[in-house]
Swiss-Prot record:
Gene assigned in the entry: hsrA
Assigned protein family: Belongs to the major facilitator superfamily. EmrB family.
Pfam families listed in its UniProt record: MFS_1
Regions that span the bilayer: 10-30, 50-70, 78-98, 99-119, 139-159, 161-181, 198-218, 222-242, 281-301, 302-322, 329-349, 350-370, 394-414, 429-449
Membrane-related topology note: Multi-pass membrane protein
Name of protein: Probable transport protein HsrA
Length: 475
């Protein structure tokens, strides 16, 4: 392999890390600025939720298409298109003069966001042998952990000392740098052409949109609960129709043969089950600290920083842990630990010393980081190059929806305890944390289906290896 091509492949993880950082930052920085944007556009803060929902639904709808587009036109072409759309959408959002304009431009942003990270990860899957994939994905995930810490703080700073427009303008230099770097370092992997499954796209895409909408409606109590549940049931019906369609179609959008890969099926179901519990922490903890303990919003937001810090520190140790314990023992054990850590938040009180609140959050961050890395890599471990794009899309969709599902479930549990007479606000949060902890511990049973040898292809040592294939210069 030439030195030029080696440098090109070495730059690929940096491109994926940039994409992850942009998405993670954008997901958290906007919430802080919503009141300021609402004031500038002469709308109520509640109405600004449409700017968030429009992006979320667009991403949910188009993630499944990202794999087909990358297979058909190449990873470099689609990735540069995605970053371009995300960057131009950010510029347009900053220039918006009304809420309808902002919503439209957020949709454009969402089109880019739906393809950016999945295509970058697909390129990694095809470029690196499985035994090199774990440390590479670890590296890529780190900037994504910094984004949620930096987002709320940076959003507050920009709104306070500049204007809300800079919330979007900050994406532009990052996007331009990403484009230049991608043109130089992103390989243009393609596969054999296959016909686009338009019927499958409509069934699967609408199912995801309705499911996301139903969860949002249920969690935010925007409409009556029965309406939200009807939307969710309809989405499940469309998903069942897609399954029937996929069985009769030679080349469906998402092949059902994926789920014949045992580690993939366990990883997907495990992602959904465990994130029901872990997804509640960023939602419940700031609420309990503010509503129950009386903390100020800024302090409550900063209290989540130890979780992200623990996640970053744990990334450097995940590979060693997996090599020592294996995937099965690691995932079962760490999921039980996470469940116990979530449940122990029921022991916290306003009178506790601040370090007694910070330390459990730090430990939880380390545990969650280990779990997510192990869970995501075992899901992709045994996929072939032919089904890597579809499997990667399913994983991205699962991650997108399961976080919302975790928030909705924990909100529903909290509402149940709020209806109990004779309980204080703090006790209601305590009972909710105990319930979500039990759910998380129970989800560990899913990973007991793994064999002790599963994932060995990811963690075995190799003296010298190289990426699977480097495209020719013509690609």
């Amino acid at each position: 392999m030439s030195d030029k091509k080696k440098r090109s492949m070495a730059g690929l993880p940096w491109i994926a890390a940039m994409a992850f950082f942009m998405q993670a930052l954008d997901a958290t920085i906007l919430n802080t600025a919503l009141p300021a944007i609402a004031h500038s556009l002469n709308r109520s803060p509640l109405a600004m939720q449409s700017a968030i929902i429009s992006y979320t639904l667009t991403v949910a709808m188009l993630i499944p298409v990202s794999g087909w587009l990358a297979d058909r036109f190449g990873t470099r072409r689609i990735f540069t298109l995605a970053v371009s759309l995300f960057t131009l959408g950010s510029l347009a959002c900053a220039l918006s003069n009304s809420l309808p304009q902002l919503v439209v431009f957020r949709v454009i942003q969402g089109i880019g966001g739906a393809m950016m990270m999945p295509v970058a990860r697909l390129a990694l899957l095809r470029a690196y042998p499985r035994n090199e994939l774990l440390p590479v994905l670890n590296f890529v995930a780190m900037p994504g952990l910094v984004g949620p810490i930096l987002g709320p703080v940076l959003g507050g700073v920009l709104v306070t000392w500049a204007t809300w427009h800079w919330i979007f303008l900050i994406n532009i230099p990052i996007g331009i740098a990403g484009l230049l770097y991608a043109r130089k370092h992103m390989p243009n992997f393609t596969t054999a052409r296959r016909r686009f499954d338009i019927t499958g796209f409509l069934l699967f895409g609408l199912s995801l949109v309705l499911f996301s909408s139903g969860i949002e409606l249920f969690g935010e109590k925007i409409v009556a609960s029965w309406i939200a549940l009807t939307v969710i049931v309809t989405s499940i019906g469309l998903l069942l129709l897609y399954i029937l369609h996929a069985r009769r179609t030679p080349n469906p959008l998402i092949s059902l043969d994926l789920f014949k890969t045992r580690t993939f099926s366990i990883g997907i179901v495990g992602n959904i089950a465990t994130r029901l519990g872990t997804g509640c922490v960023p939602f419940l903890m700031p609420l309990m600290l503010q509503v129950g303990f009386g903390y100020q919003a800024f302090i409550a937001g900063c209290m989540m920083a130890p979780t992200a810090l623990g996640s970053i520190i744990a990334k450097s140790m995940v590979t060693q842990v997996l090599r020592r314990l294996g995937y099965r023992h690691t995932l079962v054990g760490i999921t039980v630990i996470i469940g116990l850590m979530i449940a122990q938040f029921s022991l916290q009180s306003p009178a506790m010393a601040i370090w007694m609140l910070i330390l459990p959050l730090f430990i939880l961050g380390m545990a969650m980081s280990t779990q997510f890395t192990a869970m995501n890599t075992i899901t992709l471990a045994d996929l072939t190059d032919d089904n890597a794009s579809s499997g990667n899309s399913v994983l991205a969709v699962t991650q997108q929806l399961s976080i919302s599902l975790g928030v909705a479930v924990s909100a529903a549990v909290l509402r149940v305890y709020e209806g109990m007479e004779g309980t204080t606000t703090v006790e209601q949060f305590h009972y909710t944390f105990i319930t979500m902890g039990i759910i998380t511990v129970a989800s560990a049973a899913m990973f007991m289906l793994l064999k002790t040898t599963d994932g060995n292809n990811l963690i075995k040592r190799q003296r010298k290896s190289k990426p699977n294939r480097v495209p020719s210069e013509s690609e």
